[in-house]
Amino acid sequence: MLDIKGYLVLFFLWFISTILIRSIFKKPQRLRLPPGPPISIPLLGHAPYLRSLLHQALYKLSLRYGPLIHVMIGSKHVVVASSAETAKQILKTSEEAFCNRPLMIASESLTYGAADYFFIPYGTYWRFLKKLCMTELLSGKTLEHFVRIRESEVEAFLKRMMEISGNGNYEVVMRKELITHTNNIITRMIMGKKSNAENDEVARLRKVVREVGELLGAFNLGDVIGFMRPLDLQGFGKKNMETHHKVDAMMEKVLREHEEARAKEDADSDRKKDLFDILLNLIEADGADNKLTRESAKAFALDMFIAGTNGPASVLEWSLAELVRNPHVFKKAREEIESVVGKERLVKESDIPNLPYLQAVLKETLRLHPPTPIFAREAMRTCQVEGYDIPENSTILISTWAIGRDPNYWDDALEYKPERFLFSDDPGKSKIDVRGQYYQLLPFGSGRRSCPGASLALLVMQATLASLIQCFDWIVNDGKNHHVDMSEEGRVTVFLAKPLKCKPVPRFTPFAA
């Protein structure tokens, strides 16, 4: 039996626990929060409502409580916008209050203390990095410099499709090949190398970058329950640091190789320059008010590896799945390509502006299957949206997935109809851009912190998809193409739950075998 001291200890623990829990979960009485589920469980908040894929669970809650809802995830205030109007108010009308991204434990550990463009807090140095992205690293001139790399990788990808499918006799797991393809483009642009049997270094880097993506998408209790942050009950702290050290060692090795190569070359050197060369130029630049740090350069390269690989691969897999399920769309896209390009050469990036239906196909995929179904901001101060109070430091989630399926904006919202993006009186022109000006379609975000790599991603996806339409017929499920399972999986990037398996039957071979 317990003596009086034992009872006092239990009472003290109960008292402290009660005060702690109330201090964590009690909502400020004077705040008028957006509507949401009525029951918040201690320590968990509304997490039991979010057991399925997060974007799907939040969409279901929005159908019940409205386009702007409030939930507690642990002790964290989370506000979710699921309509174009609420997204516009957050990303444009009140943008200055929402210019930060939430800084998670993993992102802080893996990106050199948030030294990258994606997670760095809004301010002077962020504006400096933004300027570098737009004028140097991802400018139109820089993208044009790498056009031959992208085109040669498309050709190599098509040849590989023919080889591994036995000219259409065997199924190919498209996700694996698409990820390899997009990764090869990015690694050649960044460091002048690609993944192949002779280059284990790039293969190792790709594996580590995949680990980074998994850690960034993992649910860490310390991110949502403040007092658990230093406890690291799930062991993510150790995993984050181990992975960061591996990434840093590889990035540092590449930087040093570039420095050594630059030291040896003369003015007439014909060595092809890549993004690491541009980064080194910026690191070494004199007289700037801000200087690019070595850590920011490595963090930027890591951002490029992550965003430039899985996102485009996801969209391409979804596009193929929709095309094989909708043969009339596939037929129309191919006819457009042949009418513009002919039947004697491979479609190129320079042809894309003359292919409005192909552009519409990709837009329709991005509407229904955005690679990142939710993107996040953070409230830098307490403010109001739609008449509701948004507490300072709240996480703001913009559901691009829900907005793209909103019947208030899209007729037959769940049907795959690329024609919706063409002007009815001039089908030769495409309407509605995807770079953030139209709030009913936000696959790359909007505003100051929209994705700076949108133009590069579109170039890669459009040219690759056009070539796959031009060069192959696609057979799924022994010809039962309409039976493709369109279920979803994934946290940060959403893929098909069951990877798409196709037989690519060659139809047009525009290059030497």
Swiss-Prot record:
It is an enzyme of class 1 (oxidoreductase). It catalyses: beta-amyrin + reduced [NADPH--hemoprotein reductase] + O2 = 24-hydroxy-beta-amyrin + oxidized [NADPH--hemoprotein reductase] + H2O + H(+); sophoradiol + reduced [NADPH--hemoprotein reductase] + O2 = soyasapogenol B + oxidized [NADPH--hemoprotein reductase] + H2O + H(+). Its EC number is 1.14.14.134. Its cofactor is heme. Keywords: Heme, Iron, Membrane, Metal-binding, Monooxygenase, Oxidoreductase, Signal-anchor, Transmembrane, Transmembrane helix. One of its GO terms (cellular component) is membrane. It comes from the Eukaryota. Its main location: membrane. Coiled coil: none annotated. It is a single-pass membrane protein. The chain crosses the membrane at residues 1-21. Pfam families: p450. Heme binds at C451. PANTHER family: 3,9-DIHYDROXYPTEROCARPAN 6A-MONOOXYGENASE (PTHR47944:SF17), CYTOCHROME P450 98A9 (PTHR47944). Belongs to the cytochrome P450 family. This is Beta-amyrin 24-hydroxylase. It comes from Glycine max (Soybean).
